[in-house]
């Protein structure tokens, strides 16, 4: 195992004093979770975009994100079944929560929400969407499967997949800290980052909660 501060077999420095941080030259360590200091440096350099953000949101190895006031709910009374390849236009209904009021998420219910913050990632960085421990202990899950934000993600909000697995309703307050993002470096910049012309990137620049676009996939 390489010692701290000594070159590895790839020619990059191992973690230790003098580490430049992501995207800063030959000493960059790839494949690591970013610390608070590295997150701040990327924000200052403009390579990582989180807007708006306050310094208190930056945790030791993540950034807290807040819940926006918009939700997408399923219109169960008009839809009998969901076909991912043939999504009806009236499957979802948009709900805007007034300032000072909460959205009530009932047991077993699933809705789409959004972050307050818009996120932008460089081509050599991915983000993971994670819940908050204190909310998880209340039975709130913030994503079903979509916990991965691709490298090159253009500036846009993150859609949250909110579900209540508890036995009591949960109040969701706009502006509350709903989750956190951790950031991971790639071993090399992505050759075809999100939004590349050769990819079927369906959520470029999303604003507010965005319903499933699975029907746009080829069968």
Language-model segments: what does each one mean?
Residues 3:
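Detector for the Zn2+-coordinating histidines of canonical Cys2His2
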Residues 16:
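Acidic/negatively charged segments and metal-coordination signatures
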Residues 27-219:
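DUTPase catalytic domain/fold
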């Amino acid at each position: 195992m390489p010692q701290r501060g000594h070159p590895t077999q790839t020619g990059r420095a191992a973690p230790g004093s003098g580490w430049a941080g992501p995207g800063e030259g030959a000493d960059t360590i790839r494949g690591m979770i970013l610390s608070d200091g590295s997150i701040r440096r990327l924000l200052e350099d403009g390579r990582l975009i989180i807007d708006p953000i306050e310094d208190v949101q930056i945790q030791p190895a993540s950034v807290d994100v807040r819940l926006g006031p918009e939700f997408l709910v399923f219109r169960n009374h008009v839809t009998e079944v969901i076909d991912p390849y043939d999504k009806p236009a009236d499957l979802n209904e948009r709900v805007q929560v007034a300032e000072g009021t909460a959205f009530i998420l009932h047991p077993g219910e699933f809705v789409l929400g959004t972050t307050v913050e818009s996120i932008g990632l460089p081509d050599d960085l991915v983000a993971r969407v994670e819940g908050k421990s204190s909310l998880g202990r209340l039975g709130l899950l913030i994503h079903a499967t979509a916990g991965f934000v691709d490298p090159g993600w253009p500036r846009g909000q993150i859609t949250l997949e909110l579900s209540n697995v508890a036995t009591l309703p949960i109040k969701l307050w706009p502006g509350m800290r709903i989750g956190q993002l951790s950031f991971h470096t790639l071993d090399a910049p992505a050759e075809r980052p999100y939004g590349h012309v050769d990819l079927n990137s369906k959520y470029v620049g999303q604003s507010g909660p965005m319903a499933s676009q699975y029907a746009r996939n080829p069968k």
